[in-house]
């Protein structure tokens, strides 16, 4: 039988209405739950816990919402937690305040206008190091912006902020022994990096110059940022660049360069013992401000050209039987590590610190692909994977025609999100234990 069009529409509408009624009678609504990062185990049991003004917080059975710290929970893993949400209440259990904090972030992500979905979650981080890097030299971000970033990081359970505090773009941290680092080279003529750097101006301006671009963190700023991060269970690793990427240092203190003149190089004169005095003085002040286990010394992209003709550098090489300038860089990295160990800290650096011989206890950040990380792990060194092709957030994330100006590359969200930092085909199970985790890098030449 062929129904008239109007009758057909009525019957179809009635069928849809009946279907809706049938499905509305299902006793439990099973909501879709999306969490970043995905928990180790999650079961969605159906229904919602309603959030209202009658909630009772407690650590016993009387509480509608119960937070329980049990030091024996989950083998004592400080960052793991168990979250159970039913229609009657919520229980969050962990071995430490860190675990409770991460469970709270999961609750924040779960919240909807209908309430909190009923779930059973057992969660542990796969890696102890979950990092984000921020370059504040090429583009300066005041402490308020850094704090906003820390809020976002904590929401997604990232636990390490790597602050790139020094580079040719400007020195960004107060140093009492070297005041000209902030009075003379924390500000520059252009905010736009391309105009300033690629346009070959590259001039710094004294603090207080009208129209100058830049800024720096006072020691009190740093203390506030560190305290703010600590409250969110985030560790901050400071980076001070050695021996390269230090153009600004030699404008303020030209005697530390091979030429002894400003605007000539970005590399420290390693043959000059004053360079090591500077390094140790600066690191001492940094250590006083940052409680981090690790101090990042850079180590990347040193030009090394001036060392080949510098009498002081060549003399040091001859005295120590060095065969090339890579070993000269390694000499500085070794001395930096010895100093940091004497202060109870550990050295971490970009993968160029492998060149010329890796310092005995150094941790390596592998950014030029995974090769440096694989080599380091095989040598028994700890590694943070941060390969540019996956983890550089200054790359284009979609068709460049639709994106803000970027440095190049192509890293869509799916590529970054799906990255596995353990190269299982290249490392044994024992070697893989040296992969501490992963870090995304936000370089700011184009921000």
Task: List the predicted regions and their residue ranges.
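Flexible loop/turn segments at secondary-structure boundaries
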Residues: 140-142, 168-174, 243-249, 296, ...
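Short, basic, glycine/proline-bearing loop/turn elements
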Residues: 54, 134-135, 208-211, 355-362
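Acidic, contiguous N-terminal accessory segments
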Residues: 3, 10, 25-130, 341, ...
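Bacterial N-terminal signal peptides
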Residues: 12-21
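Flexible, acidic glycine-rich loops studded with aromatic residues
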Residues: 346-352, 360-362, 370-447
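Feature activates predominantly on carbohydrate-active enzymes
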Residues: 76-294, 335, 339, 434, ...
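Active-site neighborhood of glycoside hydrolase catalytic domains
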Residues: 249-250, 254-362, 367-378
């Amino acid at each position: 039988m062929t129904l008239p069009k109007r009758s057909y529409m009525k019957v179809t509408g009635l069928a849809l209405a009946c279907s809706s009624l049938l499905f509305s009678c299902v006793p439990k609504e099973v909501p879709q739950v999306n969490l970043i990062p995905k928990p180790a185990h999650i079961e969605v049991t159906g229904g919602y816990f309603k959030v209202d003004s009658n909630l009772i917080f407690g650590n016993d059975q009387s509480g509608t919402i119960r937070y329980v710290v049990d030091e024996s929970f989950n083998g004592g893993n400080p960052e793991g937690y168990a979250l159970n949400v039913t229609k009657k209440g919520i229980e969050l259990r962990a071995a430490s305040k860190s675990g409770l904090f991460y469970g709270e972030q999961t609750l924040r992500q779960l919240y909807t206008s209908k309430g909190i979905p009923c779930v059973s979650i057992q969660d542990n981080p796969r890696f102890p190091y979950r990092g984000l890097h921020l370059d504040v030299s090429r583009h300066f971000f005041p402490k308020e912006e850094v704090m906003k970033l820390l809020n976002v990081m904590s929401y997604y359970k990232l636990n390490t902020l790597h602050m790139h505090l020094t580079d040719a773009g400007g020195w960004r941290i107060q140093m009492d022994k070297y005041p000209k680092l902030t009075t003379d080279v924390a500000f520059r003529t252009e905010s736009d990096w391309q105009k300033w750097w690629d346009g070959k101006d590259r001039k710094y301006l004294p603090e207080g110059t009208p129209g100058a671009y830049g800024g720096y963190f006072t020691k009190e700023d740093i203390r506030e940022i560190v305290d703010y991060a600590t409250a969110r269970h985030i560790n901050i690793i400071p980076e001070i660049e050695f021996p390269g990427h230090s153009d600004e240092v030699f404008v303020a203190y030209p005697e530390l360069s091979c030429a002894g003149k400003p605007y000539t190089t970005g590399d420290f004169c390693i043959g000059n013992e004053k360079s090591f005095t500077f390094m140790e003085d600066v690191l001492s002040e940094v250590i006083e401000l940052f409680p981090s286990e690790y101090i990042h010394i850079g180590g990347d992209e040193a030009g090394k050209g001036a060392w080949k003709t510098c009498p002081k550098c060549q003399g040091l090489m001859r005295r120590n039987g060095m065969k090339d300038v890579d070993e000269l860089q390694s000499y500085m990295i070794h001395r930096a590590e010895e100093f940091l160990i004497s202060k109870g800290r550990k050295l971490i650096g970009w993968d160029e610190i492998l060149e010329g011989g890796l310092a005995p206890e150094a941790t390596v950040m592998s950014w030029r692909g995974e090769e440096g990380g694989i080599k380091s792990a095989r040598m028994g060194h700890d590694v943070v994977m941060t390969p540019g092709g996956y983890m550089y957030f200054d790359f284009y994330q979609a068709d460049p025609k639709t994106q803000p100006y970027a440095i190049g590359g192509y890293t869509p969200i799916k590529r970054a999100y799906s990255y596995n930092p353990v190269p299982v085909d290249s490392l044994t199970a024992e070697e893989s234990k040296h992969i501490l985790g992963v870090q995304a890098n936000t370089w700011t030449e184009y921000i």
